[in-house]
Amino acid sequence: MTVEKEAPDAHFTVDKQNISLWPREPPPKSGPSLVPGKTPTVRAALICLTLVLVASVLLQAVLYPRFMGTISDVKTNVQLLKGRVDNISTLDSEIKKNSDGMEAAGVQIQMVNESLGYVRSQFLKLKTSVEKANAQIQILTRSWEEVSTLNAQIPELKSDLEKASALNTKIRALQGSLENMSKLLKRQNDILQVVSQGWKYFKGNFYYFSLIPKTWYSAEQFCVSRNSHLTSVTSESEQEFLYKTAGGLIYWIGLTKAGMEGDWSWVDDTPFNKVQSVRFWIPGEPNNAGNNEHCGNIKAPSLQAWNDAPCDKTFLFICKRPYVPSEP
């Protein structure tokens, strides 16, 4: 870089750190005049030139310190500029580095933005999950409050339950009693219906005391037509009921035997208790008089009331049938 400054009679140049000072045109050399006849003019010119040189020297002497100060300032500025240039070079290098760094940072920023997008989506999902969880918590809280309320009511409910249980026990007992009473009423109704048809009831059986005498076989056929048989006797109480109801009249009962010397049996297939039956025969009976007394009847008004007789004789008769509950 070259800087030129003008002075009245000097030329000043700064080239890097080299400084030169010279007049624009070298002074004319002294010597004999080349042009004859012009000596005064030349002399005058020389004088003027001398004066100019003297003035230049004086001016240089006066201005030189100032110029030197300026040069010093210029050097300082040059050094500053050089430092700045170096700084600019360093700065350029840093800029390049920073540019590369910025590119890398741009990539990183893009990656960070992508990560932020992912994080944002995850955050939204998490937010949704938290909202759902909060809703569930509210539901659970309400449920817990309801449970707490119910827990507070448990003692009262337990007391009510115990009362209800006791009441249910009573109700079941009453229902049982009601069912039993209903069955009893139904049984009584069934009995009354049969009794209204001329039958008598005793300990689970119906007995029909006929008004018309028949032979033993005809009497049995009549009983069968009424869903019954000639009566059997299985206990002392039944024997007592029969002879008392008979009132001293003779009634065929279901006693019969097979053959001349056969064993006695009940026509309704009730097992015949020979040992027990001994107490129910009239003393001396059965005697099978005439060898044809194969059927039995009630003759005497006492426990010992049975008598054997011919089956073709006609007597009143007693039919017997068990009580069977009617359909609901």
From Swiss-Prot:
InterPro entries: C-type_lectin-like, C-type_lectin-like/link_sf, C-type_lectin/snaclec_domain, C-type_lectin_CS, CD209-like_CTLD, CTDL_fold. Glycans are attached at residues 87, 113, 180. Keywords: Coiled coil, Disulfide bond, Glycoprotein, Lectin, Membrane, Signal-anchor, Transmembrane, Transmembrane helix. The keyword Heme does not apply. One of its GO terms (biological process) is immune response. It is found in: Membrane. Disulfide bonds join 223-319, 295-311. The chain crosses the membrane at residues 44-64. It holds the Pfam family Lectin_C. Residues 65-328 are extracellular. Residues 1-43 are cytoplasmic. GO terms for cellular component: clathrin-coated endocytic vesicle membrane; early endosome membrane; endocytic vesicle; external side of plasma membrane; plasma membrane. Its main location: membrane. Changing residue 299 to A: Loss of binding to 6'-sulfo-LacNAc. Homotrimer. It is linked to Birbeck granule deficiency: A condition characterized by the absence of Birbeck granules in epidermal Langerhans cells. Despite the lack of Birbeck granules, Langerhans cells are present in normal numbers and have normal morphologic characteristics and antigen-presenting capacity. The C-type lectin domain mediates dual recognition of both sulfated and mannosylated glycans. This is C-type lectin domain family 4 member K. It comes from Homo sapiens. The gene is CD207.
